[in-house]
Amino acid sequence: MPRFALTVIRHGETRLNKEKIIQGQGVDAPLSETGFRQAAAAGQFLSNVQFTHAFSSDLTRTKQTIHGILEKSRFCKDMAVKYDSRLRERMYGVAEGKPLSELRAMAKAAGEECPMFTPPGGETVEQVKMRGKDFFDFICQLILGKAGQRESVLPGAPGSGLESSLAEVFPVGKHGSLGANPKGGTLGLAASILVVSHGAYMRSLFGYFLSDLRCSLPGARDKLELSSITPNTGISVFIIDCEEARQPSIQCVCMNLQEHLNGVTEKQH
């Protein structure tokens, strides 16, 4: 039963984030100065973590963020990033480029809650969920060896260094457990995957983990936190056990971590 770690990070701040303008997929804004500092801070925080794979949305703000993170890495500075359109932000149609207040007004006029409302030309919540599920199924199959030969699937040399490097950054008791092997013994990670994506997309993905895969949460966390928007460069870590022809099991180690932002930017709520 292969086991892997999944670290999911939201992109750094853009000027439009600060101004509460909907970006979606059609407004491809770069990071602001604050956003670049956030990416560097996240990279410094994760600098001792060994990743075997790196994936990012193909939009500018996520590309700049993942490169800012990897630049600080002791082990992954030269790692190739795979850009995947399945990791893009939710498409908001006619609301893109407009203030969040206008989207809320559209939703109110339609008699719907804003997170569930689909603007004309936008993606439904279910469509975003299916994109997330498709990507997650892909990485599970990648780890199971179905995407090619084993030697090409795990380019980053899996081994005991993966779990020890994670445990240094996310110590047991502070951020929850890195997960005991259900069959006993060591954690035995086959891979450690870094993903950089977007706020609404990540909320949908985490909701899928909770509702469909029955993700277990660290002690003090609740379901509301899993369904909230991740702050810019907020870090969430999951441990996944995958097995052929069976639903993966998933454990949340930490959710929306932002302690690396102390002194970089005000915490976002």
Curated annotation (Swiss-Prot):
Its EC number is 3.1.3.46. Induction: Up-regulated by hypoxia in cardiac myocytes in a p53/TP53-dependent manner. Up-regulated in ischemic cortex after reperfusion in a p53/TP5-independent manner. Up-regulated in primary neurons by oxygen and glucose deprivation (OGD)/reoxygenation insult in a p53/TP5-independent manner (at protein level). Up-regulated in ischemic myocardium in a p53/TP5-dependent manner. Up-regulated in small intestine after gamma irradiation damage. SMART domains: PGAM (SM00855). Expressed in olfactory bulb, cerebellum, and cortex. Expressed in neurons and astrocytes (at protein level). Expressed in intestinal crypt. The active site is at H11, E89. Keywords: Apoptosis, Autophagy, Cytoplasm, Hydrolase, Mitochondrion, Nucleus. It is an enzyme of class 3 (hydrolase). Pfam families: His_Phos_1 (PF00300). One of its GO terms (molecular function) is fructose-2,6-bisphosphate 2-phosphatase activity. PROSITE patterns: PG_MUTASE (PS00175). The record marks H198 as: Transition state stabilizer. It is found in: Cytoplasm; Nucleus; Mitochondrion. The keyword Cytoplasm applies. It catalyses: beta-D-fructose 2,6-bisphosphate + H2O = beta-D-fructose 6-phosphate + phosphate. The keyword Hydrolase applies. CDD domains: HP_PGM_like. Disruption phenotype: Mice are viable and fertile and show no obvious developmental defects. Following intestine ablation by gamma irradiation, adult mice display a reduction in the size and number of proliferating intestinal crypts and an increase in cell death. Mice display reduced intestinal tumor progression compared to wild-type mice. One of its GO terms (biological process) is positive regulation of pentose-phosphate shunt. GO terms for cellular component: cytoplasm; cytosol; mitochondrial outer membrane; mitochondrion; nucleus. Fructose-bisphosphatase hydrolyzing fructose-2,6-bisphosphate as well as fructose-1,6-bisphosphate. Acts as a negative regulator of glycolysis by lowering intracellular levels of fructose-2,6-bisphosphate in a p53/TP53-dependent manner, resulting in the pentose phosphate pathway (PPP) activation and NADPH production. Contributes to the generation of reduced glutathione to cause a decrease in intracellular reactive oxygen species (ROS) content, correlating with its ability to protect cells from oxidative or metabolic stress-induced cell death. Belongs to the phosphoglycerate mutase family. Interacts with HK2; the interaction increases hexokinase HK2 activity in a hypoxia- and HIF1A-dependent manner, resulting in the regulation of mitochondrial membrane potential, thus increasing NADPH production and decreasing intracellular ROS levels. This is Fructose-2,6-bisphosphatase TIGAR.
